[in-house]
Amino acid sequence: MSERAPVVTIDGPSGAGKGTISQLLAQHLGWQLLDSGAIYRVLALAAIHHDVELENEESITLLAAHLDVKFLTGNDKDPVQVILEGEDVTTDIRTQECSNAASKVAAFPRVREALLRRQRAFRTAPGLIADGRDMGTVVFPTAPAKLYLTASAEERAQRRYNQLQDKGFDVNIERLLSEIIERDERDMNRPVAPLVPAEDAFVIDTSGKGIDEVLELALKYINEKLSSAN
């Protein structure tokens, strides 16, 4: 890992626009991209592919330490393209089987430690955009620029509703809103790495804002921070 390679962390709750803004920033700056929210799913899928028992902490930890994963800028449908061992698994990691397996492997402390090191290894020249929930507080606490994107639960539910409708799913917006509120409560009050802005994070409320406006605010902040750091 190069400590001199700059890193911009982007944290916040689901539906706040982290994925889209991370993709656009990575494209604009020509930097590496890390989607930390997908990494446990990727590890779970790798375990399934290699017939590794999900209950075997030692084997899963070894797999985590050598996980061959890349995150590329994607498209409007999937802002981040996930590549595992040279194969596009963007859709594969979203299955219920993969989700269930991810919950199992994430329960192992040694696996979490191995993936923490693996995530930090993404910090290479020319720079890194790190998208997640604890990037600025746990994974890259010394990052020179930290963003925290948020939005009202109602707006995030509407965005998620629109996304699922576009993909042909029949969804109930009231249920989505309830799930988002419950997840926020759980994430913000968990004892380990709770979802909170870093003390030195620049908070952007994306409610009622278009992508271009949020991107402009983010770039202005990042340029100011990186200029003062040099």
UniProtKB/Swiss-Prot annotation:
Q: What class of enzyme is it?
A: transferase
Q: Which UniProt keywords apply?
A: ATP-binding, Cytoplasm, Kinase, Nucleotide-binding, Transferase
Which Gene3D superfamilies does the record cross-reference, listed alphabetically? P-loop containing nucleotide triphosphate hydrolases (3.40.50.300)
Entry annotated with the keyword ATP-binding: yes
According to its UniProt entry, the protein's GO biological process terms are: nucleobase-containing small molecule interconversion; pyrimidine nucleotide metabolic process
Q: Where in the cell is it found?
A: Cytoplasm
Q: Which InterPro entries match?
A: Cytidylate_kin, Cytidylate_kinase_dom, P-loop_NTPase
User: What are the GO MF terms of this UniProt record?
Assistant: ATP binding; CMP kinase activity; dCMP kinase activity
- Got any disulfides in this one, which pairs? none
* Primary residence: cytoplasm
Query: Its GO CC terms?
Result: cytosol
**Family per similarity comment:** Belongs to the cytidylate kinase family. Type 1 subfamily.
Task: Enumerate the PANTHER family for this protein.
Answer: CYTIDYLATE KINASE, CYTIDYLATE KINASE/PANTOATE-BETA-ALANINE LIGASE
What is the name attached to this protein's record?
Answer: Cytidylate kinase
